[in-house]
Curated annotation (Swiss-Prot):
The protein's name: Tyrosine recombinase XerD-like
Domain Core-binding (CB): 1-75
Domain called Tyr recombinase: residue spans: 90-238
Organism superkingdom: Bacteria
One record GO biological process: DNA transposition
Function (record text): Putative tyrosine recombinase. Not involved in the cutting and rejoining of the recombining DNA molecules on dif(SL) site.
Locations listed in the record: Cytoplasm
Catalytic residue list: 154, 204, 236
Length: 238
């Protein structure tokens, strides 16, 4: 069975940012080129995986993840009559000096009754992975409480982030959020510090860790965070 070229259709069907779309595009063009003169078989998939072994482990995992999502799309849309999946590369254990595995925290204290601006800021960072610069650009109208999503625009790219109910029930009654969003970075820093000893960077990292644990690919996570590259996220996928 030949591999049909449905790359454009696949990308159109996904709500990717321009950068994420570009990453998927090049991964899939690489896949398509390999199968140009080959049939899709389990043996051919093993050959493809072997070819990827020349790349870094992180690059191998990204290309395999992209290929597997594409195969699923083709199968679900009846473009191929058999579902194929490439087995992910085994993540080799590295020395402790090279590995990076911070502990995931739940922060139950963040989800008590809303008591101060610092708590609201902590929730924004933990729930959406926002930094102070992004919080300063927020408007209360960006929160759609009916359909539970937050719209953020950065560098001309819109991100639509889901709002969890445990966040909504604690903050949607706020009346003066725009006043907080208009404050200086120093003000936001001070208010957060009044509420918790954790820095905005530490809380944002917890958002990243929870998304990795939930199974988000490195490209999907970069899209959620509005990042133009995946470089800063690679350490979480080693």
């Amino acid at each position: 069975m030949k591999l049909p070229n449905e790359i454009e259709e696949y990308l159109v069907s996904r709500n990717f940012s321009e950068n994420t779309r570009s990453n998927y595009y090049y991964d899939l063009v690489y896949l398509q080129a390999f199968f140009e003169d080959k049939s899709v078989t389990e043996e051919a998939l093993e050959l493809y995986k072997h070819q990827l072994s020349k790349l870094s482990p992180a690059a191998q995992r990204r290309k395999i993840s992209s290929a597997n999502q594409y195969f699923l799309f083709l199968y679900e849309n009846k473009k191929i009559n058999q579902f194929f999946k490439i087995k992910q590369v085994v993540q080799k254990k590295t020395q402790s000096s090279e590995s990076y595995h911070p502990m995931i925290k739940e922060f139950p204290e963040f989800y008590g009754p809303l008591s101060c601006p610092g708590q609201f800021l902590a929730l924004l960072i933990l729930e959406f992975g926002l930094n102070f610069a992004e919080i300063q650009k927020l408007k209360w109208e960006n929160f759609n409480w009916n359909f539970k999503y937050l719209t953020i625009e950065k560098a001309g790219i819109k991100r639509v982030l889901p709002i969890r109910e445990k966040f909504a029930i604690r903050v949607k009654a706020i009346k003066n959020a725009d006043e907080l969003f208009a404050k200086s970075r120093q003000f936001l820093y001070t208010e957060l510090k009044k509420f918790t000893n954790y820095s905005s960077k530490e809380i944002r990292e917890q958002y990243i860790l929870h998304q990795v644990k939930a199974g988000k690919t490195i490209y999907e996570l970069a899209n959620l965070l509005g990042l133009s590259t995946i470089t800063t996220l690679e350490k979480y996928y080693r």
